[in-house]
Amino acid sequence: GYRRMLSEARILLRIKDAGLPVPAVWDVDLENGRIVMERMNGRPLIDILRDDSVPDESKHLALENSGAAVRMLHRMAVTHGDLSTNNILIDESYDAYLIDFGLSAVEYEVERFGIDLHVMDEILGASHPNITDGIEIFLSGYLNCDQLMGALTELSGGMPPLAGEVMKRLEDVRSRVRYHG
């Protein structure tokens, strides 16, 4: 409903203002339940990974850039909530753009960040088994982002978790899922 739509618009504005590669919001029409936003050019990551004409090197670059885009989001204390290879667009330079923030949230607890990464891990393993080390390549982009961008900035709600803390939580989530699976 309205709350979810308003939340999505607010989060998009927050992260766009911070310079993250996401669609610009042009209008929020509560009456008709619509958000009008910029159309992003690119192909879904799922299509890039399944396209036999795309060289492995380019697929790896798309995965690495996708990991960096997710870390940039997490550095803003925002979890995606529906991270998948359908919700990442890849442009002709293999840069990554995140889309579909309907389930995203401003968050400071490390658990949901780890869950974002775990969902991507599961999707890469299940939907893209032909991509060797897909999650490792994605996570290398995630980790390298902090090295490129430097120290985290404290936000109004506190400090977002460090990449290393999120990686540790990913391992915790993986072990819980394996144990209960």
PLM regions and their residue ranges:
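ATP-binding glycine-rich loop module of kinase domains
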Residues: 1-5
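Catalytic-loop of the protein kinase fold
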Residues: 78-85
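Hydrophobic residue at the +6 position relative to the catalytic HRD Asp in the kinase catalytic loop
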Residues: 87-90
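Conserved structural core of kinase catalytic domains
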Residues: 20-63
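C-lobe/activation-segment region of protein kinase-like
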Residues: 97, 101-181
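Protein kinase catalytic-loop region centered on the HRD/HxD motif
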Residues: 69-78
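Short, glycine/acidic-enriched loop or turn micro-motifs at the edges of active sites
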Residues: 30, 41, 85, 103, ...
